[in-house]
Amino acid sequence: MTRPQAILTDIEGTTSSISFVKDVLFPYARRAMPAYVRDHGNHPQVRHWLNQVADEIGEDVPDEVLITTLQTWIDEDRKHTALKALQGLIWGDGYKTADFTAHIYADAAIQLKAWHAAGIPLYVYSSGSVPAQKLFFAHSDAGDLSGLITDWFDTEVGPKRESASYRRIAERIGVPGPEILFLSDVIEELDAAKRAGMRTALLDRLDDYPTPRSADEVGSHQRVESFSQLVL
């Protein structure tokens, strides 16, 4: 098998721990949401996303209702584009004030740097908004890694469990599906990418998945427990 022409990676559970997102980022956004909406609700960008939440509810409601809705969506881990955008704006404040840095596994940081040095273009596809992704990599435990990434994709390109999303990404980066390696910890995402013709690898990290996925679950995907085990 030849070396892929591009590598597309997920973040949560792949380059970075699930617990950081669930135990640090989500609670931070939930706590900060009321004050953020009150302080920035008249900003056009923020109001745009709040209006999308109102459209989803289907009612003309006050901001307090929107805040409660957004907090409920955080609790439910809802993959709504407006929520992800607002979370990204809030996390941006957190990174700037050094309330936290983004977790990235050491093996992921090392391998991303090596692939970049070898001339393999790197792309990110996450349910988090593109601005949030950029902040995540710019403020990681391993320093500013954002310069390693050629381009970024979020759910505006489509849901992560639909093969059409991966076809769109392949078209946008100008690389045939079979020449792209997609990395994720979610089998349904890998299945969708494979249907779009991409190569796939399951990150089955013991820190995130203490019980390894079975051979039946893994199917035809390459299974690894760290980036260092990946075979290109």
Swiss-Prot record:
Q: Name any cofactors this protein relies on.
A: Mg(2+)
| Matches recorded under InterPro entries | Enolase-ppase_E1, HAD-like_sf, HAD-SF_hydro_IA, HAD_sf
Q: Which GO terms describe its molecular function?
A: 2,3-diketo-5-methylthiopentyl-1-phosphate enolase activity; 2-hydroxy-3-keto-5-methylthiopentenyl-1-phosphate phosphatase activity; acireductone synthase activity; magnesium ion binding
The highest taxon in the source lineage is Bacteria
Name one process (GO BP) from the record: L-methionine salvage from methylthioadenosine
Supply the enzyme class, top level.
hydrolase
Q: Its catalytic activity?
A: 5-methylsulfanyl-2,3-dioxopentyl phosphate + H2O = 1,2-dihydroxy-5-(methylsulfanyl)pent-1-en-3-one + phosphate
Keyword Hydrolase present in the record's keywords: the answer is: yes
**Keywords, in A-Z order:** Amino-acid biosynthesis, Hydrolase, Magnesium, Metal-binding, Methionine biosynthesis
- Which EC number(s) does the record attach to this protein? 3.1.3.77
- Free-text cofactor note: Binds 1 Mg(2+) ion per subunit.
- An example of a Pfam family matching this protein is Hydrolase
Which pairs of positions does the record mark as disulfide bonds?
A: none
Q: In which pathway does it act?
A: Amino-acid biosynthesis; L-methionine biosynthesis via salvage pathway; L-methionine from S-methyl-5-thio-alpha-D-ribose 1-phosphate: step 3/6; Amino-acid biosynthesis; L-methionine biosynthesis via salvage pathway; L-methionine from S-methyl-5-thio-alpha-D-ribose 1-phosphate: step 4/6
The family this protein is said to belong to: Belongs to the HAD-like hydrolase superfamily. MasA/MtnC family.
Under HAMAP family, the record lists: Salvage_MtnC
What does it do?
Bifunctional enzyme that catalyzes the enolization of 2,3-diketo-5-methylthiopentyl-1-phosphate (DK-MTP-1-P) into the intermediate 2-hydroxy-3-keto-5-methylthiopentenyl-1-phosphate (HK-MTPenyl-1-P), which is then dephosphorylated to form the acireductone 1,2-dihydroxy-3-keto-5-methylthiopentene (DHK-MTPene).
Q: How does it assemble?
A: Monomer.
Quote the protein name from its UniProt record.
Enolase-phosphatase E1
Organism in which the protein naturally occurs: Xanthomonas axonopodis pv. citri (strain 306)
Top-level taxonomy: Bacteria, Pseudomonadati, Pseudomonadota, Gammaproteobacteria, Lysobacterales
